[in-house]
A protein has these predicted regions:
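Topology signature of small-to-medium multi-pass alpha-helical membrane proteins
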Residues: 1-155
Length: 155
């Protein structure tokens, strides 16, 4: 406990949530680099058809690699944010809110890119929507929680 504040959620965030988010983000980047991002479901089977997509839309491969790089950069931002939160740095909360914003922007930008380049969005649409809703909910939770503890971040 720092001051009169209980910091269980803070400790959960810095010791588990942000490390887990970093691992998930890096794991999510892998398909973009190895060409496993475009799939169709065919009678309970997922079939990746990147070769077909890339043949019809050559720029999509470049976009996929670019988004893989975005995910890696986002993972680095998460680690920096975790370190700043752990040290109660002055800019830590702004970085946390930025991370939550980026977690909405990257999937949204990827969805828009797919719709513009390919003309439609594959099976990941629901995952994108769920991740965006989760980010908004987390933003609200963190805003309330850290809003009450803003005075701790003075370093």
């Amino acid at each position: 406990m720092k001051g009169n504040y209980k910091l269980k959620w803070h400790k959960f965030t810095i010791y588990f949530a942000l490390f887990t988010l970093t691992a998930i983000t890096l794991f999510a980047a892998v398909p973009f680099f190895i060409g496993k991002t475009h799939a169709v479901i065919n009678s309970s089977q997922i079939i990746f058809n990147n070769a077909q997509i890339y043949a019809q839309h050559p720029m999509m491969q470049t976009y996929d690699i670019l988004f893989g790089i975005f995910f890696v950069m986002y993972a680095i931002l998460i680690v920096i944010t975790r370190q700043k939160l752990a040290g109660f740095k002055k800019d830590a909360l702004q970085l946390l809110y930025t991370c939550l914003g980026v977690s909405v922007l990257i999937p949204a930008a990827y969805a828009v890119t797919n719709i513009v380049v390919i003309g439609f969005l594959r099976i990941y649409f629901y995952l994108i929507v769920v991740s965006m809703i989760a980010a908004v909910i987390l933003f609200l939770i963190y805003a309330v929680y850290y809003g009450k503890r803003k005075s701790l971040f003075t370093n």
